[in-house]
C-alpha cells in the first residue's frame, strides 16, 4: 500500500481494518497505517533496485555513450527527468524554471533530458512550452520511445543529476535507480522521496523542503496535502548541482549507491516478501481456511 501524505486519512480506517496484513512501500505510508489503524498488522517494505542493471559504468563507457546519444554535451551539465507527463509531476514548471536557470549560467552550459510523453493527455504540451520559451535548440531534449532498462541505466550514468519535483510522490523509482547508478538527485521532500535523499546522516543530492502545502481532495479522498516548491528553491538547487565539481557530484552519487545497496537491494526484497507471504499464510490461512473471514452471513427474511 502507498499513501502519499498527511493529514492522516481517517476515512481509510475501514479499508485498512478489512485487511489481515498491510505492506507499506514507504516510511510515510507505514506511519499513516500505524496511526490510522493501529490494531491492524502492518510492515514496511520499500521498492528495490536490480543492481545487475542499474549500476555505475566506467567513465570511458559513459563518455562514448554521451557522445553518441547526446552530442555536443561534453562540457555541459546534464540534468535528467524520468517521469510521466502528468500534472502532479510538475513537468511544465520544471521547464520554465530550467529556462531561468539557463538565463543565469548560459544556454550552452547545461541540458535537460526529459524521458516522457510530450503530449500526454494528463499533462502539458511540452513541445509548445519549449517553443514559447525559446529553448528548442537542444537545451531541452525529449526521449519518448520505450527503452530497455540497460539503456535507461546508461542515461542515469550519463546524467550529472536526476530531478523529481513532484508535488505528490508515493515513492519515486527513477531517483532510486539514479542513485543506484551513482548519480545524485534533486527531490522535493515529500512522500517516499524523503527516505531516498538522506539516511539521516548523509545527503545524496539536494532535498527541498516544500515551500507551501495545499489541502486538495475529491469526493473519495476528502483531504491530502499537496507539497509545492517555488521557482526560487528549484533554480537554487539546479545552481548548487551545477556549481559542484564533477568529483563532488560523484561523491554524493557514490554515497547514494551505498544507501541503495544497503536499504533497497533485490536480495533483501525477495527474502522479505517470501517471509511476509509465509508468515501471513501461517497466521491467517488461505482461501480454504482463512481466519477472520466468513463467506456467509445470517439475515432475517420477512
Feature roles, as predicted:
Residues 10-11, 34, 49-68, 124:
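Acidic anion/phosphate-binding donor-loop and adjacent secondary structure
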Residues 28, 48:
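Carbohydrate-associated surface elements
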Residues 72-89, 95-98, 112-113:
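Conserved donor-binding/catalytic core segment of Leloir-type glycosyltransferases
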Residues 109-126, 145:
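Glycosyltransferase donor-sugar binding loop
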Residues 123-150, 154:
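Nucleotide-activated donor-binding/catalytic signature segment of Leloir-type glycosyltransferases, i.e.
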Residues 167:
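Aromatic "clamp/platform" in nucleotide-sugar-dependent glycosyltransferases that forms part
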Residues 184-187, 197-198, 204-207:
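Short hydrophobic beta-strand element within catalytic cores of glycosyltransferases
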Residues 215-227, 231-302:
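C-terminal amphipathic helix plus adjacent low-complexity
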Amino acid at each position: 500500500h502507498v499513501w502519499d501524505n498527511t493529514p492522516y486519512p481517517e476515512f481509510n480506517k475501514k479499508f485498512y481494518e478489512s485487511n489481515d496484513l498491510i505492506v507499506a512501500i514507504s516510511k510515510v505510508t507505514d506511519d499513516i497505517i500505524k496511526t490510522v489503524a493501529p490494531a491492524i498488522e502492518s510492515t514496511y517494505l520499500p521498492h528495490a533496485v536490480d543492481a545487475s542493471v542499474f549500476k555505475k559504468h566506467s567513465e570511458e563507457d559513459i563518455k562514448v555513450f554521451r557522445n553518441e546519444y547526446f552530442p555536443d554535451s561534453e562540457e555541459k551539465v546534464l540534468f535528467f527527468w524520468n517521469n510521466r507527463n502528468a500534472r502532479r509531476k510538475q513537468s511544465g514548471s520544471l521547464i520554465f524554471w530550467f529556462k531561468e536557470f539557463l538565463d543565469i549560467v548560459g544556454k550552452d552550459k547545461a541540458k535537460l533530458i526529459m524521458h516522457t510523453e510530450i503530449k500526454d493527455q494528463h499533462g502539458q504540451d511540452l513541445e509548445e512550452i519549449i517553443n514559447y520559451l525559446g529553448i528548442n535548440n537542444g537545451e531541452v531534449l525529449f526521449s519518448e520511445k520505450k527503452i530497455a532498462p540497460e539503456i535507461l541505466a546508461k542515461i542515469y550514468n550519463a546524467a550529472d543529476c536526476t530531478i523529481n519535483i513532484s508535488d505528490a510522490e508515493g515513492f519515486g523509482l527513477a531517483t532510486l535507480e539514479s542513485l543506484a547508478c551513482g548519480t545524485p538527485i534533486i527531490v522535493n521532500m515529500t512522500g517516499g522521496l524523503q527516505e531516498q535523499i538522506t539516511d539521516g546522516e548523509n545527503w545524496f543530492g539536494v532535498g527541498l523542503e516544500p515551500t507551501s502545502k495545499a489541502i486538495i481532495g475529491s469526493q473519495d479522498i476528502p483531504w491530502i496535502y499537496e507539497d509545492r516548491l517555488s521557482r526560487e528553491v528549484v533554480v537554487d538547487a539546479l545552481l548548487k548541482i551545477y556549481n559542484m565539481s564533477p568529483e563532488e557530484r560523484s561523491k554524493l552519487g557514490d554515497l547514494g549507491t551505498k544507501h541503495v545497496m544497503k536499504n533497497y537491494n533485490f536480495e533483501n526484497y525477495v527474502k522479505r516478501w517470501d517471509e511476509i507471504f509465509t508468515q501471513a499464510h501461517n497466521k491467517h490461512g488461505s482461501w480454504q481456511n482463512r481466519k477472520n473471514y466468513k463467506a456467509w452471513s445470517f439475515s432475517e427474511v420477512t
